[in-house]
Amino acid sequence: MISWLQISYGAVLSGLVAGGAVAVLARSQRLRSAVPAGVATAAGALAWNAILRAAHGDHFFTDAPLVVLPASWQDTGSGVFALASAALVLGLGVLPAAPARRVVGYAAVCALAAFLVDVYLY
């Protein structure tokens, strides 16, 4: 079972990577977008992994038999929860007047960051 230390490490790392990626993309609203995007990504990854831990979801951690992309359902769930939390935080809180395409794009970057961090870094 995944430990709280691993969950915390993965959430923080996902948030840092997502925040950095959004900072690169959001030129005019760099700090205003990047920090909340990183926090939302970390919160999403933390929430998903806490749910798996509480539900004893050991089978979600089985990696696909692909050398290039050994993803599991746990990795995918982190990306999905990061997408949802980032879309809500950015769309409803930080960038309410921004075009939906931009908000969803930033949220997708957060989801991809969380997914890739889960697959390759822990």
Which residues make up each language-model segment?
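Juxtamembrane/disordered regions of integral membrane proteins
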Residues: 1-39, 45-122
